[in-house]
UniProtKB/Swiss-Prot annotation:
It is found in: Cytoplasm. One of its GO terms (biological process) is protein unfolding. PROSITE patterns: FKBP_PPIASE. The keyword Cell division applies. Coiled coil: none annotated. Residues 162-247 form the PPIase FKBP-type domain. The gene is tig. Keywords: Cell cycle, Cell division, Chaperone, Cytoplasm, Isomerase, Rotamase. It comes from Rickettsia akari (strain Hartford). GO terms for molecular function: peptidyl-prolyl cis-trans isomerase activity; protein folding chaperone; ribosome binding. It holds the Pfam family Trigger_N. This is Trigger factor. SUPFAM superfamilies: FKBP-like, Triger factor/SurA peptide-binding domain-like, Trigger factor ribosome-binding domain.
Length: 445
């Protein structure tokens, strides 16, 4: 085997590899001889088929198999000989494969960069800590009470905010009834904003038995394109009005929600508020850590990984319509520069965390994958079971989670063992403002 290194610079390794014709012919002959003992051809006894007949029938496929094995063997030999850390599949170019000539080809291999882990103990970050107070808990209790109001008391008085109204209605555009504009026995709580803007307000002051004309304009983003932005009139008949029975927040109320007492329900809500903030805090902390890591990393990255990450980034942009805000009014050049910068950051940090996990011998446990699946499921409220079933029935999808799961594990290890964390306390209102500002800042990074 002849090996000529054509390029060994940065993350590119190119070599020209050749194998003498005699070695190729020897391999082919050996394969054909082996086949004479195995194949069955009409007119010949088993194991007695002449090589010439086998070659005539199987020669092309045997040669192709031999060439493929030789190429794979040669490439693997080069990788081991030069101790290459490769990424992706080597590319084979300029293949010389004529039957009367030596086998020759050029292999182009993309290399992983040498990643040096910086001194992470020099990094210092603030860690937000939510202090849940009694007011936060009472607000949650009041919201729960509002959601479980009982509307059993019929009212003959004028409709006011908070009443539940039962209506029939027919919608008209330019005095013509439109499809989907008929409402029958619809129950709506005034002030809930369940209907299109201003509809509910125009019912205030009416009584049971009244007929009211309600004039509205459908929002520009209304789900029906035929109605979006159009003015309409609804002829509404008030069929019934019910006022809410006051909800007493006590131990009996708590028992409706699997709590033995009101105090137990309060404790549950306090923990829930804290847990809900933790995921958002962890996401922000992770991005803040990445901000610091980005300043410490300057190694080259494989072009294929960079291109792959840019494509993912563009897909995320399209999916989330971020181009309407973040990239609005940007020139094509500025957008390209933005994609390049963010993709480079992501790839560098991903390679660093992979190297860090390797250096600390971090191994994935089943619970690590379960956490990632739970995080994905929380992004689809009401469809959690569908997400769980998808991953349960698709092992290949689970494979795709191993990278993010190991990255999360490495990040948590860094938080727990490397960097300096300074706890900074926030009230619920303060934390919500902080998280909102941070989420806008870290969009698409």
């Amino acid at each position: 085997m002849g090996i000529t290194v054509l390029k060994n610079e940065g993350l590119d390794f190119h070599a020209r590899i050749s194998t003498p014709l005699s070695e190729i012919d020897d391999d082919i002959q050996k394969e054909l001889l082996d086949l004479t003992k195995k194949v069955k051809i009409a007119g010949f006894r088993a194991g007695k088929v002449p090589v010439s007949i086998v070659k005539q029938k199987y020669g092309t496929s045997v040669r192709n198999d031999v060439i493929e094995r030789r190429i794979n063997h040669s490439v693997n030999h080069v990788i081991k000989k030069h101790n290459l850390s490769i990424i992706g599949r080597p590319k084979i170019e300029a293949l010389q494969n004529e039957p009367d000539k030596a086998l020759a080809f050029t292999v182009k291999i993309e290399l992983l960069p040498k990643v040096t882990i910086p001194d992470l103990k020099k990094i210092s970050l603030d860690r937000p800590k939510l202090e849940v107070n009694a007011k936060d808990v009472e607000e949650q209790l009041e919201k729960l009470a509002a959601l479980t109001k009982s509307y059993t008391k019929e009212s003959k008085a004028k409709i006011k905010d908070g009443d539940q109204v039962t209506i029939d209605a027919i919608g008209y555009i330019k005095d013509e009834a439109f499809e989907g504009g008929q409402l029958n026995d619809l129950k709506v709580v005034i002030g809930s904003n369940a209907l299109i803007p201003s509809f509910e307000k125009q019912l205030i002051g009416s009584k049971t038995g009244s007929e009211v004309d309600v004039n509205v304009t459908f929002p520009e983003n209304y789900h029906s394109k035929d109605l979006a932005g159009k003015e309409a009139r609804f002829a509404v008949q008030i069929k019934a009005v019910h006022t809410a029975e006051p909800t007493v927040i006590d131990d009996e109320f708590a028992k409706k929600f699997q709590s033995n007492s009101l105090e137990e329900l309060r404790t549950h809500f306090a923990k829930q508020i804290e847990n809900e903030s933790e995921e958002a805090i962890n996401t922000i902390m992770k991005m803040n850590l990445f901000d610091q890591l980005e300043k410490l990393l300057d190694f080259d990255v494989p072009a294929s990984l960079l291109e792959q990450e840019k494509n993912i980034l563009k897909s995320e942009t399209d999916k989330n319509n971020q181009d309407e805000s973040l990239l609005k009014d940007k020139s094509p050049k500025e957008i390209t520069e933005y994609y390049n910068k963010v993709a480079l950051r992501r790839v560098r940090i991903g390679l660093l965390l992979a190297e860090y996990a390797k250096s600390k011998n971090l191994q994935l446990e089943p619970d690590d994958l379960r956490k990632v699946i739970m995080q994905r499921a929380r992004n689809f409220p009401g469809q959690e079971n569908m997400i769980f079933d998808f991953y349960k029935n698709n092992p290949s999808a689970i494979e795709g989670l191993k990278g993010p799961a190991l990255e999360d594990k490495a990040v948590q290890y860094i938080f727990n063992n490397e960097i300096k964390l300074k706890e900074k306390k926030y009230t619920k209102e303060e934390l919500e403002k902080y998280l909102e500002a941070e989420e806008q800042r870290i969009t698409l990074i």
